[in-house]
Amino acid sequence: MLAKAGFDFSVSLVKRGHYPRGGGEVIVATQGGSKLRPLELVSSGRVLSVGGLSHCVRLPSHVAVRQARAAEEVLRTLKVPIRIEVEHYEGGPDPHLGPGSGITLWAITERSILGGDSLGERGKPAEQVGKEAASALLKDLSTGMALDSHASDMLLVYAALASGTSRLGGASLTSHARTVIDLIKMILPKVSIRIEGGADEGPFLAEIQGGLSAL
């Protein structure tokens, strides 16, 4: 999504970290120097396919498999191709500090990509983890907006820094999104933000007139 704004970066996963021991590690590389372009991400359009990655570390491989199967069962209502990969380390070197599992899903649509995820925890069935992620994705897709409930707040920052007017359609005006908006107004008082909708954390449309010149 950030590539649409001209933000050039890459992220590589070295190892995962789960509560409480943590220990996760990623490598992020980015190129600076160019101005960000405004974003036009309002409606998602038709769903084309769904992908995903279900993982577990220091746990039996069937945990990741069950998460994936449960998610796929929920997502079949979309009637599109679904491919959820499974990642585990059973029987091989495992650099992780503690056990954990999770699943990330993404829906590729005509004009956007929306995601949903869930983490495992002690006493929580793998099937519940998969269903939670799939249900979250379906809920956001049902709004018809281009951004899921997590991307809705994160992209507001980049839109505020982009040169020009951005229009963002978010699945949910969460408390996080409202906090981001308040912070942008405090730090970048010249940036104009107009919000339509969003009552009771519902779908919303944001119009942001930003740019580094507003600093």
Where are these regions (language model features)?
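Glycine-rich phosphate/diphosphate-binding loops and the adjacent beta-loop-alpha structural elements
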Residues: 54-58, 140-142, 159-167
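Flexible, glycine/charged-enriched surface loops at secondary-structure junctions
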Residues: 6-16, 75-96, 140-154, 167-170, ...
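Phosphate/diphosphate-binding glycine-rich loops and adjacent basic-rich segments that engage nucleotide
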Residues: 4-7, 12-71
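A short, glycine/Asx- and small/polar-enriched loop/turn
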Residues: 21-24, 97-101, 202
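C-terminal, non-catalytic macromolecule-binding modules
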Residues: 123-140
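Proline/glycine-anchored alpha-helix kink/cap motifs
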Residues: 1-6, 44-51, 129-134, 149-164, ...
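Oxyanion-binding "anion nests"
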Residues: 66-114
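Internal helix-turn-beta structural module
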Residues: 161-215
